[in-house]
């Protein structure tokens, strides 16, 4: 069970979900919850809601679906990307880190800082 939780968390963390662009995370979670036989719904703000059946005390769990990341602001003629940070990403931790550039419509391009 411990290994399964680790695998599920790793898979979830690899789903791109920058602040304001959390749809892929919500879709991933919705699919996983529906596979467990649970119904889901979304509100007008994009929050994913699920109710677990039971008779015990009601508990609400909420968390962010978004991640720190970057937005591409310019693509230079040589293909170099100029990016702007979203959130508190520390610059000193970036060199050599793998990145995933989400082009749109599920088309992603792997790269390195």
Model-derived segments and their meaning:
Residues 1-113:
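N-terminal hydrophobic/helix-forming segments and targeting peptides
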